[in-house]
């Protein structure tokens, strides 16, 4: 019954920021409001080189692989501060690690159009450099709805394979743009390409409003990505309710060793364990649902094909979901035999 658990194709990290990761311990973490740490991050980004980004991201990837991750989707900042250095580095890593892990890249509008209008042209240039998705953030511009519209228009113009939004990340009920995003996706019939990351405010709006929004999301065919480390500063979204509605939910590490989270080793079982504790995924079926979340490979067909072609399997000695989530054991990474025709 559980054979797929002890031997699988590997784990999926649905959301991270490899370009800004592994700054700690060289940079000493200091706790401060998010806006202050965002400013510090911009200062560091101005110092980034392509090789610096490559080296730090490589370190994170090697850790992920050690823990059994064979698929990762990473946001990469694109703005006048860092330019296209992160995209260039990640495209090189994508090729260098092609036989070990599938890396999907999302060109990310972290800073917004208001702060840096030049970002629009840089994002457009990034989208011509290789096959990648596009990423926005519902809270970085004064008019979040306009931000969503502009990002969706760019995604359509360049026919991107996926579009992601850091969605309502503050967790405040007044920052609730998820229904608008779902409405736009439904209207444009593109929800199967759209990923709503975090969705923290869904946890703080009234239950009736949340239920209506989840129904709208399901009708729009949106995907959701949950990052449990966000619990340090805000409520986690309604994961169980989203799963019950049949919405595809993936799990992401989010930040790793940066100025927003100095911890994070890329062990997806560890992140699943954290979510299990925080939201009480304790019943046997719920534990299996958690493992399904971290085994959810890429929905994009080309990425899924690349993932399928990896000659790698992740093997655990136990067949019990409870044991995996309780002890977070290290896997054995094995090379699958390739049968010649």
Predicted feature residues:
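Histidine-centered catalytic micro-motifs
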Residues: 9-21, 76, 162-171
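Active-site mouth loops of central-metabolism enzymes
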Residues: 39-55, 106-117, 137-141
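Active-site core of metal-dependent hydrolases
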Residues: 111-114, 127-235
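Alpha-helical scaffold segments that flank or form the walls of functional sites
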Residues: 6-7, 24-75, 81-98, 121-127
